[in-house]
Amino acid sequence: MRPLILLAALLWLQGFLAEDDACSSLEGSPDRQGGGPLLSVNVSSHGKSTSLFLSWVAAELGGFDYALSLRSVNSSGSPEGQQLQAHTNESGFEFHGLVPGSRYQLKLTVLRPCWQNVTITLTARTAPTVVRGLQLHSAGSPARLEASWSDAPGDQDSYQLLLYHLESQTLACNVSVSPDTLSYSFGDLLPGTQYVLEVITWAGSLHAKTSILQWTEPVPPDHLALRALGTSSLQAFWNSSEGATSFHLMLTDLLGGTNTTAVIRQGVSTHTFLHLSPGTPHELKICASAGPHQIWGPSATEWTYPSYPSDLVLTPLRNELWASWKAGLGARDGYVLKLSGPMESTSTLGPEECNAVFPGPLPPGHYTLQLKVLAGPYDAWVEGSTWLAESAALPREVPGARLWLDGLEASKQPGRRALLYSDDAPGSLGNISVPSGATHVIFCGLVPGAHYRVDIASSTGDISQSISGYTSPLPPQSLEVISRSSPSDLTIAWGPAPGQLEGYKVTWHQDGSQRSPGDLVDLGPDTLSLTLKSLVPGSCYTVSAWAWAGNLDSDSQKIHSCTRPAPPTNLSLGFAHQPAALKASWYHPPGGRDAFHLRLYRLRPLTLESEKVLPREAQNFSWAQLTAGCEFQVQLSTLWGSERSSSANATGWTPPSAPTLVNVTSDAPTQLQVSWAHVPGGRSRYQVTLYQESTRTATSIMGPKEDGTSFLGLTPGTKYKVEVISWAGPLYTAAANVSAWTYPLIPNELLVSMQAGSAVVNLAWPSGPLGQGACHAQLSDAGHLSWEQPLKLGQELFMLRDLTPGHTISMSVRCRAGPLQASTHLVVLSVEPGPVEDVLCHPEATYLALNWTMPAGDVDVCLVVVERLVPGGGTHFVFQVNTSGDALLLPNLMPTTSYRLSLTVLGRNSRWSRAVSLVCSTSAEAWHPPELAEPPQVELGTGMGVTVMRGMFGKDDGQIQWYGIIATINMTLAQPSREAINYTWYDHYYRGCESFLALLFPNPFYPEPWAGPRSWTVPVGTEDCDNTQEICNGRLKSGFQYRFSVVAFSRLNTPETILAFSAFSEPRASISLAIIPLTVMLGAVVGSIVIVCAVLCLLRWRCLKGPRSEKDGFSKELMPYNLWRTHRPIPIHSFRQSYEAKSAHAHQTFFQEFEELKEVGKDQPRLEAEHPDNIIKNRYPHVLPYDHSRVRLTQLPGEPHSDYINANFIPGYSHTQEIIATQGPLKKTLEDFWRLVWEQQVHVIIMLTVGMENGRVLCEHYWPANSTPVTHGHITIHLLAEEPEDEWTRREFQLQHGTEQKQRRVKQLQFTTWPDHSVPEAPSSLLAFVELVQEQVQATQGKGPILVHCSAGVGRTGTFVALLRLLRQLEEEKVADVFNTVYILRLHRPLMIQTLSQYIFLHSCLLNKILEGPPDSSDSGPISVMDFAQACAKRAANANAGFLKEYKLLKQAIKDGTGSLLPPPDYNQNSIVSRRHSQEQFALVEECPEDSMLEASLFPGGPSGCDHVVLTGSAGPKELWEMVWEHDAHVLVSLGLPDTKEKPPDIWPVEMQPIVTDMVTVHRVSESNTTTGWPSTLFRVIHGESGKERQVQCLQFPCSESGCELPANTLLTFLDAVGQCCFRGKSKKPGTLLSHSSKNTNQLGTFLAMEQLLQQAGTERTVDVFNVALKQSQACGLMTPTLEQYIYLYNCLNSALLNGLPRAGKWPAPC
């Protein structure tokens, strides 16, 4: 401190002196103001708690000195203590050695001359220091931590303690303490968790902090268990521990002192210690660890199992036993030896012992030794056994048995010796001297029971005598009784006698018996046991056994034993009723006895009921008051001394108690429910028996716990008696009988067929017996019974007549039997009002006058609906009106238009009647044919062909009904006279008339939904008319010139038919045979001969080959060779291509085929049909059945022509008479019609017409109109059911033949939406009807043919029959032979398939069926316009899953079908068949081009759309404009503008610079906008060679950005503009459209596809996106759409359909 003060003083003094000098130098100068600007001063500690650093910035230039002073400040803010001073000329100064955290006052003085000093006073504080000695340790609790620290040097205001959970970084505690606090305890912490503690020292706003980490202690497990798993493994278990991150296990071997440790992760609560020492105690300790903490938990002690000793051997030694073994692994506490046998002994040995001696003398016998090893609480033991024989007990000094042989001859000869031999040994066994005079010889130490020979030899070696004998055998060992299996048997056994023997002998004697011992039994040497039989039960016997060898016996062994007493015999247990008790009886057993032991058990549950000891004389015993219905068992045994015999058993029952509260109820006509209540006691089962009139009907056995049962299949309405019996074993007790009735049977369904005024009620009764009961049908009106009628049980049908039409009543059937009655549910009969009758339509040009008769009944109004028929078979709603009258005028209609009128009556019960529909056409306004039409064209040939042109009589020629050809030989007539139509060929040929009507035929241009021909050529003079005076196209007179005129007959329903004539044609000469060249005639003759020979050879070959199958019997044999050769069957995979090819050029190929078929079969005889008696039976005079195939009815007596009906057998696919085709019945042929049905066993009738159309009756109503049957001849027809649907009606009839007394059911299927001479609206409806027909035919049991009819039985009938046959052919042969099928049909019935439209429609149906594919294929294909939005939504579902699936099919089809337009096999077409024409493709290069290559493709547009030529690649002006001219293009579309960076293309002419090529010259005419605002350029193209000109409209549409599709509205608007351009001009056929794109082929593909799809939608009302995309992709791979573009086609088309097609839906216009 002193140096600082001194330094400060020196600095001050120096400054003072300097200031004085300065002030001296300023004397005489002006005074300056005192003070000056302040300094900018900054104070900091520079990170040091004992320093303060001052820095400043002077406000004035120039060097000044600075004086600084520093003093500490107390808590009240007053300076105190020693002042520190300093002086400097720098801009900063640092004070050292200050107190941390203390406040100081600083003064900074700027020393300026003349004492104008400036002083600044500041207060600052030094930074505090951190605490010292910070510690954080456990406080003895898992949830607490204790923190402690020492004071921080210097001053401070407080300490802040922040405790964080380290893992989650969450704050656990935040507390501030005073500076005097030096410790803190944290509680409620998580055990086993690491925390960080921050201690912050605060001094004002300054702070210093330090931190420390620490863990809380974990919670050790409170339970530990140790379990032995074997000799070397222990398993430890413990419960969970809170906060432990791991567990330390220490297992201590308490014998060896070794430790085994393991560290277990958290979450595991078990561990197995392996490879331990067997038989060793172990102590386990567990420690829970968390961080540095290890907390020991409980301990456990357990032993391992001891290991087993091995090689235990028990050896007999004389009269003692010796045991030895090998010790097992590991440790043990000792051994326990337990010897059992004739003598028992237990001893213990130390753990180190391995042998033991059991000292003798031990009695002989079988001994077993159990050696048990002990280790703690566990042991392990093994056993060994051996036999101890008596020989082992012989004294050691006895060497063996002794042989004593007598019979030695006495001799005094010295030196004699006795030589001993054995039978088993080859040499001498002994050699002893024989004393003189000895008479016996003795050998010792021999084998007992053995045979020996002794030779007596002299001193010279001579044998003087040989003697032999046996040693005495030893007795058998261990004689004992081993079994007493029967009271009269004892089984004894013994051990083999030592040595040798020849056998054993056994004898026995009963104690107390005066008889001698029993029979002696001699046994072989190997027998060691014997069963003594037929002994007296309950008696004691002494048994002796010994061994023998030779004549010697061993000592006998004796044993004393007793037989067991015999059990009592014939024990029985039964129930005695007088008195009521359970009684046991028995007979005395043989043998001895002292008493009887008697026990009685109840078996369920097993309970001892009684136990008695009865005297030996007792033979029965009884028990009273036992539980009823229980099974008991008695056990009886004989007592004799301490012995007890086996038990004799017998069972018996106590009778059960009868059930109570028996109740019988009926819930159904064939059921009875029986219930009862249990009574106390037991039972084994219940038996419930059902009786009907004392006859047992059924029996049911129930379990003892059941309290009810049901009887099924009973007779309804019948009284029954029920008996319930409770059984207990063989005993039973019956309850009182109970009687009950079953409910009467009622119909389970009432089927009501309603007609106006009556109802047929069919009662469906349940199957089975009807039973008894009385039934009534009841009608109620407004809840009151109004009518009742008795019914018979099982009655199936009854009629309700005179019901009020339009009224509602309720009906039920009620039946009663005994006290029970049942009723069906109420059936509400809402009687349908009858239909209107006598409907008459009076047509006019602009209105229809309608009259009818209202039906009787409770009716209200009549609803009249008017619909206009539109082309294609559809209708357009016009209006509807309700009226209560019977006449109505329908105004404001269109002339010559067909309307469908539907009249429906509304009853007051809100029921509508059956609609009566009729088609009525307004009449035409006055038809004004030309006065004289242009003459027809005549074609020359062997005959003459007159060509009739469509429109030759004006645009209203659709009103023409018939055309006629008038021929004349008058060369001066300008036009025919009206009288000419009255003359025929007969008048001309035989009577000399110049002009005559040669031919009359219906209008071939009748409007159809399919395209018709533009001209019709008919041959004249082709028929051989003989003498017929009718209109006949007879041969013309040779050598005459003829002129021809066409006459038209109107279709007006006026009294006088309007006629129109054409001018006569130029004269043409008829060709006579006389002028035909000879070579031509000879060629014709030879050709005819060759054809005849070929046919004869073919027939001969068929005869040799044998008959064909029925299926092919009518295929080709009657067909001209050239037709069969030309028209082959079409394979299924090629059918679509064939169809599209035949559809080209206005169905020209179809027309040619149909023309070829017109004359088929016409020359076949029809004599029976033309007979005068039968003419009136034909509906149309030109539709007559051929004789060879007509159906013949049974001829009626006296009526030779009654077998005729206008019907033919038609061969089906598999049978020659599979189908009958007939006309719709006339009133006069109704009886014949039903005779046909009955005699031919027809079960299915197909009706393809309505009864009336356009006011014309097409077919009589030949079935009952309601439930009232009708009779025709002997056949009565009942209408059983009628089910009308949208497009067909199903009916079922019952036919009853009056004379044959037989019944038969016939089903009728009527297709109601097929107009006469026309086709249905769509193939799908007819195909669905065919499937229904096939199902009904298969379900019909009858084998008769199918009957098909329409009106004439040829047009619609022929189409339907051909479709049936061809569908079978498709299924069986995978081909379709349409032409030959129709050919065969026409050979059997004329005019089968009557119109060209029907012929084409037949092909359409087959194509639709082919494209349907398998039933389980995908649902892509042609989609109806009405269903398109739903189809789009279905495909877009699940992230466009449907689109993705269909697009994959498209890619596969493109890959697989390189040349085929058929979709892949799993591709499915549904709904309406697409009629897109085949694509004709040509290319300028062989492969699909890149952008620099050129390719052109042609897409024909069909009859109503324009042809479309697509040009891709870089086309020059020559290629482009010459292609425009060659393809007669009138509209040119250019997609995409050229790149602005490239040179403008030179394919477009400019105003003053036309384009000139070798073929054409192209001029720009004008530029304008189309009506829709699209830029358009008009060009004039001049052909150089011919000079012809043509105007070409060019629309240029800029494409969108690359990779983006145009907005749907933009593309649709552009297509509309293109369509307007295509259809300009007078031609009905639009001009060709040529589209060109040099680069954007994808967008060109989208443009082309949308153009084709919109045309489909407009013309066909279906769209086929799949096939359109497939065709384009096969035409050019660059136009293959991406998945996004494919989805775009759907979305764009859906937008067009939802918002209306372009041009108000008239899309046939677009190209």
From Swiss-Prot:
InterPro entries in the cross-refs: FN3_dom, FN3_sf, Ig-like_fold, Prot-tyrosine_phosphatase-like, PTP_cat, PTPRJ_TM, RTP_Phos/Ushers, Tyr_Pase_AS
Short name of one Pfam family: PTP_tm
Domain Fibronectin type-III: residue ranges: 37-129, 130-222, 218-305, 306-391, 393-470, 475-569, 565-654, 655-749, 744-831, 832-926
pH dependence (record): Optimum pH is 5.6.
Transmembrane regions: 1075-1095
Enzymatic reactions: O-phospho-L-tyrosyl-[protein] + H2O = L-tyrosyl-[protein] + phosphate
PTM comment, free text: The cytoplasmic domain contains potential phosphorylation sites.
Enzyme class label: hydrolase
Residues carrying sugar: 42, 74, 89, 117, 174, 239, 259, 431, 570, 620, 649, 663, 737, 851, 882, 970, 982
Bilayer topology term: Single-pass type I membrane protein
One record GO biological process: cellular response to epidermal growth factor stimulus
Cellular-component GO terms for this entry: membrane
Cellular compartments annotated: Membrane
Membrane topology, Cytoplasmic segments: 1096-1711
UniProt main location, coarse: membrane
Annotated GO MF terms: protein tyrosine phosphatase activity
Entry keywords, A to Z: Glycoprotein, Hydrolase, Membrane, Protein phosphatase, Repeat, Signal, Transmembrane, Transmembrane helix
Keyword Oxidoreductase recorded: no
Secretion signal, residue range per the UniProt entry: 1-17
Regions of this protein lying in the Extracellular compartment: 18-1074
UniProt-listed Enzyme Commission number(s): 3.1.3.48
Residues of the Tyrosine-protein phosphatase domain: 1150-1409, 1427-1696
Keyword Transmembrane: yes
Binding site residues for substrate: D1316, C1350, S1351, A1352, G1353, V1354, G1355, R1356, Q1394
Function recorded in the entry: Protein tyrosine phosphatase that acts as a regulator of energy metabolism. Prevents decarboxylation of osteocalcin (Bglap) via an indirect mechanism, preventing the hormone activity of osteocalcin. Functions in signaling pathways during bone remodeling, as well as serve a broader role in cell interactions associated with differentiation in bone and testis. Associated with differentiation in bone and testis.
Annotated protein name in UniProt: Receptor-type tyrosine-protein phosphatase V
Species for this entry: Rattus norvegicus (Rat)
